[in-house]
Amino acid sequence: MRKQILIINRVPCFFILLFFLFSLTYLNSQPPKHSEKEKIGYLLETLENSNLIFIRNGDEYSSKEARAHMQKKLEYAGNRITNVDQFITYLATKSSISGKPYYVKYPDGKKVESSIWMRELLNNLEEKK
């Protein structure tokens, strides 16, 4: 009788231990998420290296100039920008003075709003992880 009780008590413990081990394996197999700061850095670096034309208030700028401008805006915003969505929405999509949207222009002349372009980059980054 005593052996039956011990066996019955061991069975749930075995399954709990097994579940715990599988959970740890699953959690360790997930790639680490990028921090919000890393995501913003990725967008800025990709912009700088894109060699696209950046259009701000109707004027064209190089991708390096665009990155410098957005970096300045980010530094000025300080801790008010806490995630990549805020960065795109408040800093990388339109002029804070005129309210006009920013655009990126491809070598073939196609223009796309910077918000769309950046959100596509962000989606690509999220899919890679």
Where in this protein do the model-derived segments appear?
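Compact alpha-helical subdomains of small soluble proteins
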Residues: 32, 53, 58-129
